[in-house]
């Protein structure tokens, strides 16, 4: 990933591998329901959706400032993922999709815990940008989760 290449912090490499597993889970759903993969031909860091491209550009710029800023960007991405998945779950009744989203959310909560721990070790703090402070605190104060 961009931030791993910039800072060589292991958490970025570890989570990148996990994120590939998440992408594979979504691809299984796309294949099962005969849907086109909207990112099949995209290179890393390239998004057809302008909003996502702008967010990527903004976050990579922020994460390039310092290794601590990079860790905060990692936490922000997981924070946003949790928010987006929670929102998506309110609109989905297909049990296959719900199961994948719920497992993705577990992964994102675990990643948020890991990034936050690294932020603290680096002497920083993190304030959630998308989920509430109460949700963030509940995640941070709970143990790592496993998938189904």
Residue ranges and their predicted role:
Residues 1-148:
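All-alpha RGS (Regulator of G-protein Signaling) helical domain and cognate RGS-like helical scaffolds
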